[in-house]
């Protein structure tokens, strides 16, 4: 295992100003890791489990910095780092709604000329597998521009745009959401087990899933996706026929949307799953707050 930064640490990233900056990753146990960013410096030792976490002293707002991490054998750098305000956009579909899909979102995206917003989208995956590793490797901090800002959460975009107008610094948004999920999906198992309601929900889900294998879950999901696509095709046909059709009329003609999805340990709707595969992958990245 060689020295490695967590996936969220990429070129063009934004780190929180005026607060201690947490930098973390993996490496060879017992090796010393040094971390520097602009005028801040820190060192730490890789733990027995191969993880490390260092804390840099606070920095004022600024841009064009280089983050350097080294264990004496391997060195990694991240360039074009900005120090500004960082917010995590979390939740379900109301936060997940992309700017391009919101009211006037396409026009707003095309007209956007700002340079002060950057965003990182945590890979949406409910299993820590090879695909998850590939998605994290491909993930990137992006400088919001007309050609990509439509991908950003609409809520987060308007929040960041207003914040950028009020503050003379770069605004960083960490997108971490999944439509239709409950808070239980984003909580650790230990936290769920610490309260009666959490214990009850975990027990109920385990009883429902039982000994279902990954293969069985995959087969159920294929059947579910086929049903959903058939329903969506009927909805699209009705809307093409009558653009002003109401949801009541759609439901009468096409039936209710197939929901919920099948249960399974690989499901994003399984309690604690997204805590492991999404939230924990970016914690403890230093933030100003959470939307």
Predicted regions and their residues:
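Cell-envelope and extracellular/periplasmic
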Residues: 1-291
């Amino acid at each position: 295992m060689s020295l490695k930064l967590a996936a969220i640490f990429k070129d063009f990233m934004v780190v929180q100003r005026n607060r201690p900056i947490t930098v973390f990753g993996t490496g060879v146990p017992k090796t010393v890791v040094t971390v520097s960013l602009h005028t801040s410096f820190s060192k730490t030792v890789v733990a027995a489990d191969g993880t490390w976490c260092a804390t840099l002293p606070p920095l004022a707002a600024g841009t064009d910095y280089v983050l350097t991490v080294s264990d004496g054998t391997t060195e990694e750098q991240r360039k074009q780092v900005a120090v500004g305000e960082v917010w995590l956009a979390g939740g379900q579909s109301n936060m997940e709604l992309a700017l391009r899909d919101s009211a006037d979102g396409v026009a707003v995206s095309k007209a956007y000329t700002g340079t002060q917003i950057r965003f990182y989208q945590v890979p949406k995956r409910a299993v820590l597998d090879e695909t998850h590793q590939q998605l994290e490797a491909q993930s990137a901090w992006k400088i919001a521009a007309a050609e990509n800002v439509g991908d950003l959460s609409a809520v987060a975009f308007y929040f960041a745009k207003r914040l950028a107008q009020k503050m003379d610094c770069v605004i960083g948004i960490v997108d971490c959401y999944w439509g239709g999920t409950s808070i239980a999906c984003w909580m650790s198992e230990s936290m769920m087990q610490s309260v009666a309601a959490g214990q009850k929900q975990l027990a109920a889900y385990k009883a429902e899933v039982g000994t279902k294998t990954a293969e069985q879950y995959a087969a159920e999901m294929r059947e579910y996706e086929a049903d959903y696509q058939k329903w969506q095709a009927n909805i699209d046909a009705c809307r093409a026929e009558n653009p002003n059709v109401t949801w009541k009329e759609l439901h009468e003609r096409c039936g209710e949307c197939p929901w919920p999805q099948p249960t399974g340990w690989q499901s994003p709707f399984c309690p604690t799953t997204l805590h492991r595969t999404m939230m924990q992958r970016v914690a403890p990245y230093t933030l100003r707050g959470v939307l």
